A protein has these predicted regions:
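N-terminal leader/assembly segments
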Residues: 1-67, 201, 206-207
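Amphipathic interaction/junction segments at domain boundaries or subunit interfaces
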Residues: 37, 41-145, 166
Length: 207
């Protein structure tokens, strides 16, 4: 893993510029600015991992005050996928996921996440048809954010009735138990308006 953990500009853009466009209140933008993310200025090429975790925590608290921090982080993970598809790199990557399907999408987990940071490593264990364990080396203090990204990516790849459970989270690494129903024949991305329904069709438990 890299000596200094960095999150790249395109990840910040996917969440805060694209995925949450028009949804950030002034109080949230002010708190983000204080934490090191000024959305009124050009984004930096990369941000420290600890700062990234702070940005996500602030957004979760500000946008989803009636929900737990973990539930809000999950929604931010989905927003990351929604926003990523609006970037040039994201459009290319998510189009590929539709072709690959859910299983091969998971096989590319490290490569997919490394498009947005310099530290992700993963190991995938296939337990049965549409049933996997995905270990990730660093998910920070908000593992449900990564779960939301996995959920959104699998949905993009055509999976339905997605279920994600967390196991063995130690503050850094986490194992995600993932299962889904048969992939849909037409695996287009659910639009932003479908986000709530898509979340309800999935499940996550902290064990």
């Amino acid at each position: 893993m890299a000596d200094e953990l960095l999150v790249f500009e395109q990840t910040i853009e996917a969440v805060f510029v694209r995925g949450l466009h028009g949804r950030l209140p002034a109080t949230c933008k002010a708190r983000l600015r204080q934490a090191g993310l000024d959305l009124d200025q050009k984004l930096r090429p990369a941000y420290p991992f600890d700062a990234w975790m702070a940005f996500l925590r602030i957004a979760s608290e500000e946008l989803y005050p009636e929900q737990t921090l973990e539930q809000g982080a999950w929604k931010l993970g989905e927003a990351c996928i929604d926003g990523f598809q609006e970037t040039m790199l994201g459009r290319a990557m998510l189009s590929l996921l539709r072709v690959l399907g859910p299983r091969r999408t998971l096989l590319r987990a490290t490569q997919n996440f490394r498009a947005g940071n310099n530290y992700t490593e993963s190991r995938l264990k296939e337990l049965g048809p549409r049933n996997f364990e995905l270990w990730m080396n660093e998910v920070g203090s908000l593992p449900t954010f990564t779960a939301g990204i996995i959920f959104g990516g699998l949905r993009t790849a055509g999976a339905t009735s997605i279920r994600i459970e967390m196991d063995g989270y130690d503050g850094h690494a986490c194992t995600y138990r993932i299962s889904w129903s048969e992939a849909s024949v037409s695996s287009g991305v659910a639009g932003k308006g479908d986000s709530r329904a898509a979340t309800r069709s999935g499940s996550i438990n902290s064990l």
